[in-house]
């Protein structure tokens, strides 16, 4: 395909137009009085959201240069969302401010690479200041306040705080759609995985369709179990011990399954057979996790063990096991605490060394099952559109709360950025590097100004006022009052704040050092009658 090339100012201004088109749509959502954006869907109901990354993903521009500019800013929002789970709109606003201020300096003839170094050094100094001023999240109320701000709903914040209190920092909190109105929290103590009983005949409670085993032995097998003769020696030992048996294997089939079902129906022996979760290497790893949690051993040819020779000492134990048709929950496994802690440390190390987002996600799930628990927040709403929007807000708020616990919190409302400006006062930079640092200085006020603008206040006057207030004090845009923001519960996780700044600065530096843009030449479309007008809005100065 033929290419079109733009150089110098034309290239940069084309990218800026794309950035402004996207940023102007996203930034109206910032702050407690921000608006929503409606996203059309080709099928089904439209989505109403105030989530920056969701809006950014939907924007596709026609002009090739503008499209590239918008795509670069999408990366800012996406990366911030991936790292911190929130702050996508703030990152977009910062990127727009950095690029706008930077291009003014480009027009004045500043050296691009010098500016870039200045921006990087300034961001490093501001990040250090943010981390230094962060306060640890110590109370349930602080978690509730932080999550509540992210979700725009105090009740959601309180529910997330309760969930984190129950399952711990490493615990899994999932959000599901509910058919009932309102919010519900379900807690699972122990390990749960998404595999249920192989046969419905194993159910001990026909009404609830679940099998409950009290104080069972747990047999873990790394292969298929098909013949009775392999299983019989071990079964006899378990029957003599007078305990029920949970079998977790790659599969249980044929006469082995038939024998277990018949014994259950006759009432001579209570057991449940379940397929092991996952597949391939992940199945082996999860079986090993269950073995450590329950104090058992995976019976596998790889470790020289077979069912025929296995003794009862190789079986795991738990206080209770509940199995439904879809999932298995092991409560209070009998594994050694030190062995479990060692396994947790091993998984954490694997997470840190993993380059794959998918692998990290699966490792995080394994870590949570061993180290914490599982909390399920069920969200309901009056309409499908409202339900989707609410579920998304809760998911963002959960990640926001975890980020707060991880690195601490700083004053929200854009105040932390503005009050970090003094970190640049002691800089000994000259020339274009000093210009780059000044670009960051100017841009740091942009989030607060946008929050003020969305709240119907005068941005410039407010920014000047807040910059002279004591650290941590600023405008609460919800109440229009000046107060100690941390004490008032207006806080942002420092992980979200620093990630937004770092990612915005990274893309801005690329914008400002661009000298040419190569894009696909638009194909000529066949003439069609006009159906309306298109309006465009550029960057807004304060």
Swiss-Prot record:
Give the enzyme's main class according to its UniProt record, as a single word. Answer: isomerase
Q: What's in the GO CC field?
A: cytoplasm
Which top-level group of life is the source organism from? Bacteria
**Where is ATP annotated to bind?**
29-32, 86-90, 413, 492
Xref: SUPFAM superfamilies: GroEL apical domain-like (SSF52029), GroEL equatorial domain-like (SSF48592), GroEL-intermediate domain like (SSF54849)
* Cross-referenced PANTHER family: 60 KDA HEAT SHOCK PROTEIN, MITOCHONDRIAL
Give the protein's recorded name: Chaperonin GroEL
Q: Which species is this record about? A: Nocardia asteroides
């Amino acid at each position: 395909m033929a290419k079109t090339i733009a150089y110098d100012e034309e290239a940069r201004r084309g990218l800026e137009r794309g950035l402004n088109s996207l940023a102007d749509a996203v930034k109206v959502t910032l702050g407690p009085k921000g608006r929503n954006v409606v996203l059309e869907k080709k099928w089904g109901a439209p989505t109403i959201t105030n989530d920056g990354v969701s809006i950014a993903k939907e924007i596709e521009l026609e002009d090739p240069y503008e499209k590239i500019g918008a795509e670069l800013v999408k990366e800012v929002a996406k990366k911030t969302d991936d790292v911190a789970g929130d702050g996508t709109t703030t990152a977009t606003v910062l990127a727009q401010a950095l690029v706008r201020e930077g291009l003014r300096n480009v027009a004045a003839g500043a050296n691009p690479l010098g500016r870039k170094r200045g921006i990087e050094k300034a961001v490093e100094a501001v990040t250090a200041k943010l981390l230094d001023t962060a306060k640890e999240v110590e109370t349930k109320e602080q978690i509730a306040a932080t999550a509540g701000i992210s979700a725009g709903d105090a009740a959601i914040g309180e529910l997330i705080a309760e969930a984190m209190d129950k399952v711990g920092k490493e615990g899994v909190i999932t959000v599901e759609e509910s058919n009932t109105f309102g919010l519900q929290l379900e807690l699972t103590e122990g390990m749960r995985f998404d595999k249920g009983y192989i046969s419905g005949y194993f159910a001990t409670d026909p009404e609830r369709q679940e099998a409950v085993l009290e104080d069972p032995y747990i047999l873990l097998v790394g292969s298929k179990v098909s013949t009775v003769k392999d299983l019989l020696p071990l079964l006899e030992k378990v029957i003599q011990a007078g305990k029920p048996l949970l079998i977790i294997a790659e599969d249980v089939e044929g006469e082995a399954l038939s024998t277990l079902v018949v014994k259950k129906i006759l009432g001579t022996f209570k057991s449940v057979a379940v397929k092991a979760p996952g597949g391939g290497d992940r199945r082996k790893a999860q079986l090993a996790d269950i073995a450590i949690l329950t104090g058992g051993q995976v019976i596998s040819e790889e470790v020289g063990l077979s069912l025929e020779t296995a003794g009862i000492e190789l079986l795991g134990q738990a206080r209770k096991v509940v199995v439904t048709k879809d999932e298995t929950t092991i409560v209070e496994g009998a594994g050694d605490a030190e062995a479990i802690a060692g396994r947790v440390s091993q998984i954490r190390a694997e997470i840190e060394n993993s380059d794959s987002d998918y692998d990290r996600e699966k490792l995080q799930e394994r870590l949570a099952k061993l180290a914490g628990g599982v909390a399920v927040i069920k969200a309901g709403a009056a309409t499908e559109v409202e339900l989707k929007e609410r579920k998304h807000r809760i998911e963002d708020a959960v990640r926001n709360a975890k980020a707060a616990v991880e690195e601490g919190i700083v004053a929200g409302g854009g105040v932390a950025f503005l009050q970090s400006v003094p970190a640049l006062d002691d800089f000994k930079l000259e020339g274009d590097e000093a210009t780059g640092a000044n670009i960051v200085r100017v841009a740091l006020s942009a989030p607060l100004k946008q929050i003020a603008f969305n709240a119907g206040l005068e941005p410039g006057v407010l920014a000047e006022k807040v910059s002279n207030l004591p650290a941590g004090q600023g405008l609460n845009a919800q109440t229009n009052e000046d107060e100690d923001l941390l004490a008032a519960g207006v806080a942002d996780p420092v992980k979200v704040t620093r990630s937004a700044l770092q990612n915005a600065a990274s893309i801005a530096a690329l914008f400002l050092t661009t000298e040419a843009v190569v894009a696909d030449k638009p194909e000529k479309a066949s003439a069609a009658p006009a159906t309306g007008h298109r309006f465009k809005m550029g960057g807004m100065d304060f």
